[in-house]
Amino acid sequence: MSDPADYSKNELMIAASARLLAGVENCFVGVGLPNVVCNLAQRTVAPELQLVYESGVFGARPRRLPLSIGDPTLATGATAITSMFELFAFYLQAGLIDVAFLGGAQIDRFGNLNTTVIGDYAQPRVRLPGSGGACEIAIHAKKILVIMRQAERSFVEKLHFRTSPGHSGGVEHDRARGWSGSGPTNVVTDLATYRFDEETGEMTLGTMHPGVSFDDVRASMGWEPRVAPDVAETPPPTDEELRLLREDLDPAGIYTK
């Protein structure tokens, strides 16, 4: 499938994100698009992937796409079912989570995320859901993958509030603060994919999706992005990935359309 008309933007985001999980042992999943991503990866590039859900489920192998982190299908065949406290304390904070997905209303060039407020904190224009466990996940998971739609209002020079830390002062700064995780490593949007510079911690354009130009990317963010010397076109979803998404994981198109 090479024609963008053959697949949706969400299907491309999901497929591109799932490929980043090749060889990963376990992943803190979450809800929404990451839920579809991880279940697709488990059926393609990472068949041994252990799906970890915030509700206390480790090693989920759901027979269908779970509707939430509390969906009963997650319990069937799971490696372990524990409490949310134990999952965070003895798995996440112990450094046993390889990859976790996060998203947000805003992200900056260093991968810091805002899920708290839009506007002034004391008198916000919009009050968002908040951190939940995102701050702890951002600090303690070995790697963070971010998946979100790209727009100038969400890719901002300065966050209205920093909920979950990225590489705020560079990679060495993060390590000096005692954070056990490596922070964000990749961002996947509906326009492009990004990775983070190992020294500066700054987001770097890695690939652009089929039909997307650099001008499209630049117009959808609040700063001049770093561009990798080997920037390329994002590989489109394969026929098998699309079949799994449309027939197995999300036949109703709740997340993929």
Where are each of the predicted segments found?
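N-terminal active-site beta-alpha-beta segment that forms phosphate/nucleotide-binding
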Residues: 1-78
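Structural signal for hydrophobic packing residues in well-ordered secondary-structure cores
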Residues: 21, 25, 41, 45, ...
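A conserved C-terminal secondary-structure "cap"
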Residues: 220, 228-257
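Generic hydrophobic, helix-prone segments enriched in Leu/Val/Ile
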Residues: 38-39, 187, 245
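Conserved phosphate- and dinucleotide-binding cores of soluble alpha/beta proteins
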Residues: 2, 65-233, 237
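Short, Lys/Arg-enriched charge-dense amphipathic segments
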Residues: 48-57, 76-78, 110, 125-129, ...
